[in-house]
């Protein structure tokens, strides 16, 4: 199976600024977190929704977001909800540029709360409390992707 031809079915080229071409692929979900185990668990849940996960640590994910606009982003906040803080400005810029708060962003948090209560209303659409289970996360992914 040729991955390039498969991706081409879902890819749209866009421009973020005059010097950067970005690829929009709504079938992909960027899964970001420092814990490789949590990234694998979340990626399997994403696959159950019929989507293709891209699993990366925060430093690599920042580079990926410069060239790819995924259908959604899932951030694992880690033990203190700060693991992905360096990505927030880039995600906020993507969402402002889209004009529609896209891509949707899910934060996996150790605390219960709303994006507003955590001070992330401009960047995060939904907060899902840990532990991560398919019963909690999959309906949220499905709802955000289909909005």
Labelled PLM ranges:
Residues 35-38, 76-83, 112-114, 134:
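Short acidic, S/G/P-rich loop/turn micro-motifs used as interaction or catalytic elements
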Residues 98-113:
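A short, hydrophobic beta-strand element within the central beta-sheet of small alpha/beta folds
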Residues 1-39, 43-45, 94, 98-102, ...:
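Non-catalytic signal-transmission and effector/linker regions of two-component phosphorelay proteins
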Residues 56-72, 76:
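Acidic, metal-coordinating helix/loop segments flanking the phosphotransfer/catalytic sites
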Residues 130:
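A Lys-centered signature of the CheY-like receiver
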Residues 74-101:
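Conserved phosphotransfer microenvironments
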Residues 59-64, 83, 115-116:
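Short acidic active-site motifs
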Residues 85-86, 110-127, 139:
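Alpha4 helix (beta4-alpha4-beta5 surface) of REC/receiver domains from two-component response regulators
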């Amino acid at each position: 199976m040729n991955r390039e031809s498969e991706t081409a079915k879902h890819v749209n080229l866009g421009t973020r600024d005059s010097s950067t071409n970005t690829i929009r692929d709504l079938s992909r979900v960027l899964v970001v977190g420092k814990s490789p185990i949590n990234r694998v668990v979340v990626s399997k849940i994403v696959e159950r929704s019929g989507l293709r996960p891209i699993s990366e640590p925060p430093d690599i994910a920042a580079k990926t977001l410069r060239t790819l606009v995924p259908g959604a982003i899932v951030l694992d906040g880690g033990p203190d909800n700060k693991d992905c803080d360096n990505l927030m400005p880039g995600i906020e810029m993507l969402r402002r540029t889209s004009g529609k708060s896209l891509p949707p962003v899910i934060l996996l948090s150790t605390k219960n709360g709303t994006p507003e209560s955590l001070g992330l209303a401009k960047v995060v659409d939904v907060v899902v409390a840990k532990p991560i289970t398919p019963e909690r996360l999959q309906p949220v992914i499905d709802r955000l992707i289909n909005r």
